[in-house]
From Swiss-Prot:
Protein's UniProt name: Acyl carrier protein
O-(pantetheine 4'-phosphoryl)serine: modified positions: S37
SUPFAM superfamilies in the cross-refs: ACP-like (SSF47336)
Entry's Gene Ontology cellular component terms: cytosol; membrane
Residues covered by the Carrier domain: 2-77
């Protein structure tokens, strides 16, 4: 797993309190990992802080899964 994926997974596990093995590429933050809309906003803010990037609102709405987050951050970094 890439450094970006490892760091994203750590953030997801810490913020959502889920088991690390539940965080798969296709895992939906809401449907599979139990996040609500506030959780997803907090995740985006944590990603921005961790990676020193800005995620515009329209882009944030497209980040629905762990894989989406890794792909977006990898391309933005």
């Amino acid at each position: 797993m890439s450094d970006v994926a490892d760091r994203v997974k750590k953030i997801v596990v810490e913020h959502l309190g889920v088991e690390e093995d539940k965080v798969t590429e296709s895992a939906s933050f809401i449907d599979d990992l139990g996040a609500d809309s506030l959780d997803t906003v907090e995740l985006v803010m944590a990603f921005e802080e961790e990676f020193g990037i800005e995620i515009p609102d329209d882009a944030a709405e497209t980040i629905q899964t762990f894989g989406d987050a890794v792909k977006f951050i990898s391309e933005a970094s």
